[in-house]
Amino acid sequence: MIIAIDGPAASGKGTLAKRLAAHYGFRYLDTGVIYRAVAKAMLDAGADLTDEARAAEVARTLDPSRFDDPALKSHAVGEAASVVSAHPQVRAALVEFQKTFAAAPPGAVLDGRDIGTVICPDAEVKIFVVASPEVRAHRRFLEAQSRGEPADEAVILSDIVKRDERDKNRSAAPLKQAPDAVLLDNSYLDIEGGVRAAIDIVEAVRAGRRRV
């Protein structure tokens, strides 16, 4: 079984995906980390983030050991990832890696922005996770505080709104809900409530009550 979880930045999709993977014993891939790793490599090299050919070359030679770098979680890297992920050549370079991961038994949970529409369009379960920009900005603010990083919630909110626009309007794999995805708004759900709602969706599919 493949579970595809998509949604905008800081919507809580990563937490849901990790918990679902643990619950069902499936492999988990945060596809956003892949793009963050490309962005971090570009930043480290002092490269122009708008240089699509350079970014695509980084993507093709990406070292998976980079995926565990704590620096990938920084706000600056996240913003840079939004830029490089808009390049069609970068996305094309990383598609096969994601598809191969998803196809491996016993099952996989992937979260990102185009899992249900591009990477795994035939996924048995598709969930589109959303939350209001204000709630998402506050979450990111608290995350930054927990890491001891200086943060301005108003700036984070502005960045999130701009990122949403970039993600929705990019030419390559824009952020959008797949027609057969279930919408899950977790603006006012705690983590456990969101996980329970997601498990209910998956169980409905497993029981044959619903083709998501």
Curated annotation (Swiss-Prot):
It is found in: Cytoplasm. It holds the Pfam family Cytidylate_kin. It catalyses: CMP + ATP = CDP + ADP; dCMP + ATP = dCDP + ADP. SUPFAM superfamilies: P-loop containing nucleoside triphosphate hydrolases. One of its GO terms (biological process) is pyrimidine nucleotide metabolic process. Disulfide bonds: none annotated. Keywords: ATP-binding, Cytoplasm, Kinase, Nucleotide-binding, Transferase. GO terms for cellular component: cytoplasm. ATP binds at residues 7-15. Belongs to the cytidylate kinase family. Type 1 subfamily. This is Cytidylate kinase. The gene is cmk.
